[in-house]
UniProtKB/Swiss-Prot annotation:
It comes from Arabidopsis thaliana (Mouse-ear cress). It is a single-pass type I membrane protein. LRR repeats lie at residues 80-102, 103-127, 131-154, 156-179, 180-204, 206-230, 243-267, 268-290, 292-315, 316-341, 342-365, 366-389, 391-415, 417-435, 437-461, 462-485, 487-512, 514-533, 534-557, 558-582, 584-606, 608-627, 628-652, 654-674, 675-698, 778-801, 802-825, 827-850, 851-875. This is Receptor-like protein 15. It holds the Pfam family LRR_1. Residues 24-916 are extracellular.
């Protein structure tokens, strides 16, 4: 009997299965044809097969089984279409009429499809009303502008609308959305909307549960303005606080100001509140503790002040994510020692909160995944109990505190991300760190006082990708287990330590490394052969060590090398030709060595290059093709000779430094074509002739954005080792379904880009000293130095057009004539040196208009007249005017009452001054000859005085003869 029952049950299941199979219908032909038509208009023919390989046009092909298509199993009609992320035609306009055959479509995904607009020649703006069942529309990451809202207003059935990362700007067009009364989720993040947020208009969307306006430029106050304040769009009480169904609200990364409105507490169903990266002020209201449904609270990166107590969050039993950070230094986070919270956090970030100890309530947290307590004043031992209590902890950020003891757990942990940089650790680095944290992907212990050798246990971190041990006092050789065991390493920073030995004399397992920083150590010997195996290496910095020998030719054969820095060593010999024929190389710094030989005649790079070869023993001439691809060329203090070449293709060069060589001849007129020049230094050579007036045509920043120059080189790589886990996925047991944004509930710090960079440092003389400039300071420096040459003639009047120039040095030449009044137009000038020349006439009083001038030198010229006073000229001392006997007034001690100091105004032409000087020289010569003739005539007479004179001469001659014999 039991067997029959069992058989009956099986027959029933078989019959049900057959019924289901019989009820399944393939897609209908009309929609199949429409899908092919849609593909033809959106995907190029050459890409369609590779993008959608399952889309075949044979009779047996069921379009319901195609990639990106889903159908109703009973009717066979298409319900979902997804072209998201496919390679669509660039700037394509979508013809909405192509969608009309899909009457039952509920979800349409065209995200990341490069669409730029919609159109329908028949239905116009009302086209989307044809799709009566459309509920989900994803148009994120395209190129749509505000005109799309005219079409969207007809899609009244929509419940979910994604428009993030498009080209929308200006005022937010809320009126076009007010008819979408079924909307539950609206994502307009990462656009360029500005002005006030029109919450009053959005209040008609009564069903709205999730609103994301993050990453825009919205401004205005979030303070309660009052229900009857009709002239303010951002009326919180009559707007956002009436959205009673709101569960997620993200207004982060905008420019909102003011205090948090107290009426937010009326949104009792709120589960996600993100107001981070705004300019909110005031105290953090304790009333947030009444939002008992809250799971995600981020007030990160604002300007909150006053004190904040965790006790105010006592009733938030569902809280899992808490982020608080203030750019203001007056926020004080209090920690109650006896308080035990009801919640179990997964993420806590309390950055820049002026905390002096780890919050006590964290002792009761057992499910933490991410802890950020950086930028505080916490001292004492590293809280290893956080790791012991939270076995799922993946990220621990404790940088920029005052920890003194690096205490780690006694047993192994699964931590992935550890940053303890910039603390006060004053003892040895943990020997067993590699055994305790074998799964680390990111480790930063830089800017501490760690000493002794690097522990060999580091080699156990075979998954480590980023390691920064720089700016400590580590010494000794690199452990062999370390260079062989960390085979996943991508970026390694060992800079500014006391490490010694040879650099990779043998092969290593760092085959995946992209950036290797070993500068400012005590490494010795030759450049090791082990570097040859680093085939993915992009950036190599070995500067400021004690390396000897020659630069091996194979180093230029590393296939991915982009930046090579070996400055400040003891290298000698020629520069390998391979470095000048490497197309990928963008930064080559071989300065401050003993390299000799010549620069190869060709540079094969296709990109802008920074070439730093100063302070060597290089000789010969400069190839005239060298500047074709170079942006920065520094050849200072070498032994180059000959003429400065008539460079070709010089439009890319922005910094040209040739100081301290043996260049002769005139300044080539080709340099007048330096359309992007920022710094020009030709000083301390033997250049002669006049200064080309056409140098005034060079840019020196005029008409350029200050950000147009970027001399910092870096590398970055995306890491997917963390993947960022979604709270909705990891904690779904206490959710009722969910409409959560993954962008809100994904732990974004876990999926990060690793970055490493080196800043180009340039030395330039301003204000009578050499300073090194880099980063933002370098971008703002515009200067020309032609000093210490043999230049003659006058200062070009046209130089007054160099309006952006900050520093001009023409000292130690043979310049004559007057100081041009046009110099007064150079309003940004800070340093102006004309000393040790032959300039004449008065100092133009118009120069007092140079309000930025801090250094002015005209000493040792032939200037005359009254020294101008006022503004910056009141700050210059007498040293600025030494060697000009005809100058008077302050700050010299010479009175101007004597007529001998009077001189014709600078309105007198320069050639008139020259005539005066010629007359002076002729008069001086005539007087000298007259005196000499008078002496000789007196000696011709026979007198006691003449006999005495001849006696003395004979005695002197006899004495000299005796000394020689």
């Amino acid at each position: 009997m039991e067997g029959k029952v069992f058989l009956g049950h099986n027959l029933i299941w078989v019959m049900l299965l057959m019924g289901q199979l019989h009820g399944y219908k393939s897609c209908i032909d009309e929609e199949k044809i429409a899908l092919f038509e849609l593909r033809k208009h959106m995907i190029s023919r050459t890409e369609s097969e590779s993008v959608l390989p399952t889309w075949t046009n044979d009779t047996t092909s069921d379009c319901c089984r195609w990639k990106g298509v889903a159908c109703n199993r009973v009717s066979g009609r298409v319900t979902e279409i997804s072209f998201g992320g496919l390679s669509l035609k660039d700037n394509s306009l979508l013809n909405l009429s192509l969608l009309h055959p899909f009457e039952d479509v509920r979800s349409l995904n065209l995200s990341s499809s490069r669409c730029s607009g919609l159109f329908d020649d028949v239905e116009g703006y009302k086209s989307l009303r044809k799709l009566r069942k459309l509920e989900i529309l994803d148009l994120a990451s395209n190129k749509f502008n505000n005109s799309i809202f005219h079409f969207l207003s007809a899609a009244t059935s929509l419940t979910t609308l994604f428009l993030r990362s498009n080209n929308m700007d200006g005022s937010f067009p809320a009126k076009e959305l007010r008819d979408l009364t079924n909307l539950e989720l609206l994502d307009l993040s990462r656009n360029r909307f500005n002005g006030s947020i029109p919450i009053q208009e959005l209040s008609s969307l009564r069903k709205l549960k999730a609103l994301d306006l993050s990453g825009n430029e919205f401004s205005g106050s979030m303070e309660l303005q009052g229900k009857f304040c009709t002239d303010l769009l951002f009326s919180i009480q009559s707007g956002i606080c009436e959205l009673n169904n709101m569960q997620e609200l993200d207004l982060s990364q905008n420019k909102l100001v003011g205090h948090l409105p107290s009426c937010l507490t009326s949104l009792t169903g709120l589960r996600v509140l993100d107001l981070s990266s705004n300019k909110l002020t005031g105290t953090v209201p304790s009333s947030l503790g009444s939002l008992q449904s809250l799971e995600y609270l981020s007030l990160f990166d604002n300007d909150f002040e006053g004190s904040f107590s965790f006790g105010s969050l006592a009733n938030l039993s569902n809280l899992m994510v808490l982020k608080l950070c203030s750019k203001s230094s007056s926020l004080q986070v209090l920690s109650e020692s006896s308080w035990k919270p009801k919640f179990q956090l997964s993420v806590i970030a309390l950055r820049s909160c002026n905390m002096e100890k780890v919050p006590h309530f964290l002792l009761h947290q057992k499910d933490l995944r991410h802890v950020d307590l950086s930028d505080n004043n916490i001292s004492g031992k590293l809280p290893s109990w956080l790791l012991a209590n939270n076995t799922k902890l993946k990220v621990l950020l404790l940088q920029n505190n005052l920890f003194t003891s690096f205490q780690i757990p006694k047993s192994a942990h699964n931590l992935l991300f550890l940053d303890v940089s910039a603390n006060d650790f004053n003892h040895l680095f943990p020997e067993n760190i590699g055994w305790i944290f074998p799964h680390l992907r990111y480790l930063n212990t830089s800017k501490n006082n760690f000493q002794e050798n690097l522990p060999s246990s580091l080699g156990n971190m075979n998954g480590i990708q980023y390691m920064d041990l720089s700016r400590n006092s580590f010494h000794g050789n690199l452990p062999r287990s370390f260079v062989n065991g960390c085979y996943s390493m991508a970026i390694l920073k060992l800079s500014h330590n006391k490490l010694s030995g040879e650099i990779f004399p043998e092969s290593t397992n760092f085959t995946n490394i992209l950036g290797l920083f070993m500068d400012n150590n005590l490494f010795t010997g030759k450049i090791g052969q082990g570097l040859r195996s680093l085939i993915n290496l992009e950036l190599l910095d070995m500067s400021n060590n004690n390396l000897t020998g020659v630069i091996p030719s194979w180093i230029g054969e590393l296939p991915s090398l982009t930046a090579l820095l070996i400055s400040d060593n003891f290298l000698k010999g020629d520069i390998p030709m391979s470095l000048f024929n490497k197309s990928s190389l963008q930064l080559l710094d071989l300065s401050a060595n003993s390299l000799s030989g010549v620069i190869p005649p060709q540079h094969d790079s296709r990109n802008g290059v920074v070439l730093l070869l100063q302070d060597n023993k290089l000789s010969g001439t400069i190839p005239d093709t060298l500047l074709a691809n170079v942006e920065i060329l520094d050849l200072r203090n070498n032994r180059f000779s000959g003429k400065i070449p008539e460079f070709i293709n010089i439009q890319n060069i922005s910094i040209l430094l040739l100081r301290g060589n043996n260049f002769t001849g005139q300044i080539p007129h080709q340099l007048c074509g330096l359309s992007n020049i920022q710094l020009l230094d030709l000083s301390n050579n033997r250049l002669n002739g006049t200064i080309p007036s056409c140098l005034s045509n060079t840019s020196f920043g005029f008409g350029k954005e200050c950000t147009s120059y970027d001399y910092d080189f870096g590398i970055s790589f995306p890491s997917d080792v963390f993947n960022g886990f979604s709270l909705h996925q990891d904690f779904s047991s206490n959710k009722n379904g969910g409409i959560y944004f993954k962008s809100l509930l994904t732990l974004d710090p876990l999926s990060m880009d690793y970055k490493a960079a080196t800043q180009t440092k340039i030395e330039f003389a301003t204000k009578h000293r050499y300073d090194a400039y880099m980063g933002g300071n370098l971008k703002l420096l515009f200067g020309m130095d032609l000093s210490e040459n043999e230049l003659s003639g006058e200062i070009p009047v046209e130089f007054g057009g160099l309006l952006e120039l900050r520093a001009l040095n023409l000292s130690h030449n043979n310049l004559s004539g007057v100081i041009p009044k046009s110099i007064s137009s150079m309003e940004k000038m800070e340093s102006f040196d004309l000393s040790f020349n032959r300039l004449q006439g008065r100092i133009p009083s118009q120069l007092t208009e140079l309000t930025s001038l801090s250094v002015f030198k005209v000493s040792h010229n032939n200037l005359s007249g009254v020294i101008p006073q006022g503004r910056q000229f009141n700050t210059f001392d007498a040293e600025s005017y030494f060697g000009n006997r005809l100058l008077c007034g302050q700050p010299t001690n010479r009175s101007c009452n004597n007529n001998s100091y009077e001189e014709a105004d600078n309105g007198v032409e320069a050639d008139e001054s020259i005539i005066d000087m010629v007359s002076f020289y002729l008069s001086f010569a005539a007087a000298y000859v007259t005196i000499l003739i008078g002496i000789l005539a007196s000696l011709s007479f026979d007198s006691p005085w003449s006999r005495f004179w001849f006696y003395k001469v004979d005695a002197f001659i006899k004495k000299v003869r005796n000394l020689l014999l």
